[in-house]
């Protein structure tokens, strides 16, 4: 069962001080939120001096609250001409404010300061109150906030990051002892960089003890506004106890990469790498980008929901929310593409299916700006069509034109991308620290220290992978001409889907035919799609022309055996097999990897949901940045997971 998030209660004392009724404590010192942020946390960590000249600098905070420490740090970064190239701020919050309450709190706190603009941007970008990591970018991606919504005791051990500074800012230890526990400090030590610093307003004995036990050295400093003392210090363990060191940037002489495959996965990678200053050669075997499954007229876009909030649910939720944020950023930058904005409804296929939806909805407790449960009457009213059962309404779900999205992402990369269409890679070769993409004629197409395979089923061949289970699945969609269907106000899915296009055409589909590689449109596929949509939405489809006159399209999804994509660094399978005995109990982090070789493929029918998140994950891995997902979700998409299972079961091929 997921841990439901309980929002914070907005409350003020008579003197205007913001308080937490849940914890019986104030949010900031009487001297003011920004005075505390600047004196205790920014100066206490010797900032901005410590981030100057760095490529990336990462701050981890234990309690986000109203975000004033983040806003003050952002302002300090903005005012520093020698600032780091990219500032990451990771913060944990068990009880996030709603967007409206955050906006009200910040309008009160920033009054009379120069931070109104940043406060507005933060509130505008505030995510829905659902568990997990939420990544928000500001300053064109140079200031990155990762909000970890949930209990820090559970989420901190799942953080993959190298922290340069810590802001220890929960409510007082006497009010919220859990956030100052030994487990929390051990989790902080696990992600601490060698020269990491910390600062906290508290000088309580339990805090000092927990710091020392976790390997931190502290010293007292005068507190703010008459407070006797605060603590600052460094990570200075007496001995090394970490099995795995925090991540570092891939050591490359030049920030150049080759991305093979210009569909949703590849184009998202181009945009994310270019945003970090990488120059990318994008290689596509077809004459234009988005020519295979990404060339469909539209694709539906929504998260899964299950009562137990399993891996697929958490991954699709993270991917859904991350993609929305990235798409809005693209649109804000002027790179527009067609997508529906009227929401999407997921209809139950049976009474039992509706019960499962209701149980999942109740378990998550998500707010209405993320999902709403509709009974059959409400679903009928929403669609203005007869339906047998209710479903889930996702107000930000819908349909997207994939090729337009791909074009927008390539355009956003600007001069940092070199596009090579009509070019097929026959093999990859590595010479020292350089990868070469070689054509059928033996000529080098491109070279770079990093290659990312985003070319669906062909990735397995190019990488020589033997322990990846991929299957082609044929999908045929049908286009019903204008005037043959009733109006549909938004995309609807269930056993099949229906998407109204701007020209009045209705897209329905799609067949699911494993191991069928026939590219030709078949009448049987049209009939199957029609039967499915007539069952899902009786009354939507009227008389249609002869089936053999209908237009459609065939594309192939590449599906992984466990229905989870393959995203991340590729394993060195030969070395792993040679050391199979030693690796029989290995975790993902223990496996040898092929230097500079990554993959983003096996997205099945969820390319729109997973492509942006997968690109952000790989870009973060390359740069040694905090990862946008919890550790077990990173492991869940690791391309080496099938190799790990083979090693454990001693079933190496």
Curated annotation (Swiss-Prot):
Its EC number is 2.1.1.61, 1.5.-.-. The keyword Flavoprotein applies. Its main location: cytoplasm. Residues 260-653 are annotated as: FAD-dependent cmnm(5)s(2)U34 oxidoreductase. One of its GO terms (biological process) is tRNA wobble base modification. It holds the Pfam family DAO. Keywords: Cytoplasm, FAD, Flavoprotein, Methyltransferase, Multifunctional enzyme, Oxidoreductase, S-adenosyl-L-methionine, Transferase, tRNA processing. InterPro entries: FAD-dep_OxRdtase (IPR006076), FAD/NAD-bd_sf (IPR036188), MnmC-like_methylTransf (IPR008471), SAM-dependent_MTases_sf (IPR029063), tRNA_MAMT_biosynth_bifunc_MnmC (IPR023032), tRNA_MNMC2 (IPR047785), tRNA_S-uridine_synth_MnmC_C (IPR017610). The keyword Transport does not apply. One of its GO terms (molecular function) is flavin adenine dinucleotide binding. Residues 1-236 are annotated as: tRNA (mnm(5)s(2)U34)-methyltransferase. PANTHER family: SARCOSINE DEHYDROGENASE-RELATED, TRNA 5-METHYLAMINOMETHYL-2-THIOURIDINE BIOSYNTHESIS BIFUNCTIONAL PROTEIN MNMC. Catalyzes the last two steps in the biosynthesis of 5-methylaminomethyl-2-thiouridine (mnm(5)s(2)U) at the wobble position (U34) in tRNA. Catalyzes the FAD-dependent demodification of cmnm(5)s(2)U34 to nm(5)s(2)U34, followed by the transfer of a methyl group from S-adenosyl-L-methionine to nm(5)s(2)U34, to form mnm(5)s(2)U34. This is tRNA 5-methylaminomethyl-2-thiouridine biosynthesis bifunctional protein MnmC. The gene is mnmC.
């Amino acid at each position: 069962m997921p841990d439901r998030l309980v929002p914070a209660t907005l409350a003020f004392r008579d003197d205007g001080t913001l308080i937490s009724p849940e914890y019986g404590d104030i949010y900031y010192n009487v001297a003011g939120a920004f005075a505390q942020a600047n004196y205790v946390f920014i100066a206490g960590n010797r900032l901005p001096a410590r981030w100057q000249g760095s490529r990336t600098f990462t701050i981890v905070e234990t309690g986000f609250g109203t975000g004033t420490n983040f806003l003050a740090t952002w302002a300090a970064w903005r005012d520093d001409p020698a600032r780091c190239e990219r500032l990451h701020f990771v913060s944990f919050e068990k009880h996030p404010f709603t967007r409206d309450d955050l906006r009200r709190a910040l309008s009160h706190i920033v009054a009379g300061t120069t931070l109104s603009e940043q406060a507005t941007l933060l509130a505008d970008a505030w995510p829905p109150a659902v568990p997990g990591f939420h990544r928000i970018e500001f300053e064109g991606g140079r200031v990155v906030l990762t909000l970890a919504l949930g209990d820090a005791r559970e989420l901190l051990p799942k953080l993959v990051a190298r922290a340069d500074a810590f802001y220890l800012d929960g409510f007082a230890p006497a009010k919220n002892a859990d956030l100052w526990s030994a487990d929390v400090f051990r989790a902080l030590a696990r992600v601490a960089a060698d020269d990491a610093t910390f600062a906290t307003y508290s000088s309580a004995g339990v805090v000092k003890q927990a710091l020392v036990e976790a390997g931190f050295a502290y010293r007292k400093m005068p507190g703010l506004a008459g407070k006797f003392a605060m603590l600052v210090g460094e990570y200075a363990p007496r001995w090394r106890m970490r099995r795995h060191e925090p991540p570092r940037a891939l050591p490359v002489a030049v920030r150049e990469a080759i991305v093979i495959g210009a569909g949703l996965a590849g184009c998202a990678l181009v945009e994310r790498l270019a945003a970090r200053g990488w120059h990318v050669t994008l290689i596509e075997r077809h004459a234009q980008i988005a020519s295979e499954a990404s060339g469909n007229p539209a694709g539906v876009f929504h998260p899964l929901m299950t009562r137990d909030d399993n891996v697929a649910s958490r991954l699709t939720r993270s991917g859904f929310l991350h993609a929305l944020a990235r798409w809005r950023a693209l649109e804000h930058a002027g790179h527009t593409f067609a997508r529906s904005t009227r929401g999407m409804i997921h209809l139950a296929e049976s009474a039992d299916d509706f019960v499962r939806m209701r149980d999942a909805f109740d378990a998550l407790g998500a707010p209405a700006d993320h999902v709403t449960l509709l009974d059959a009457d409400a679903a009928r009213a929403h669609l203005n069509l007869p339906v047998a059962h209710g479903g889930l309404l996702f107000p930000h779900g819908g349909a997207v034109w994939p090729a337009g999205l791909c074009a927008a992402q390539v355009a956003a990369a600007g001069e940092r991308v070199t596009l090579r269409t009509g070019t097929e890679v026959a093999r990859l070769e590595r010479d020292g620290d350089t990868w070469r993409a070689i054509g059928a004629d033996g000529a080098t197409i491109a070279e770079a220290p990093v290659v990312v395979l985003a070319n669906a089923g062909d990735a397995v061949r190019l990488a020589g992978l033997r322990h990846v289970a991929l299957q082609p699945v044929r999908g045929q969609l049908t286009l019903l001409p204008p005037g043959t269907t009733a109006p549909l106000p938004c995309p609807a899915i269930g056993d099949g889907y229906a998407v109204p296009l701007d020209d009045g055409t209705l897209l329905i589909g799609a067949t699911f035919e494993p191991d069928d590689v026939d590219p030709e449109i078949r009448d049987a596929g049209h009939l199957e799609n029609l039967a499915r949509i007539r069952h899902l939405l009786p009354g939507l489809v009227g008389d249609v022309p002869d089936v053999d006159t209908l237009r459609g399209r065939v594309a192939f999804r590449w599906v992984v055996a466990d229905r989870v994509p393959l995203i991340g660094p590729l394993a060195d399978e030969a070395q792993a097999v040679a050391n199979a005995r030693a690796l029989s109990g290995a975790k993902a982090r223990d496996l040898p990897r092929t230097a500079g070789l990554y993959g983003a493929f096996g997205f099945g029918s969820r390319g729109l949901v997973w492509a942006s998140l997968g690109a952000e994950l790989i870009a973060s891995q390359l740069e040694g940045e905090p990862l946008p997902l919890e550790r077990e979700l990173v492991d869940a998409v690791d391309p080496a997971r099938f190799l790990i299972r083979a090693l454990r079961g001693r079933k190496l091929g």
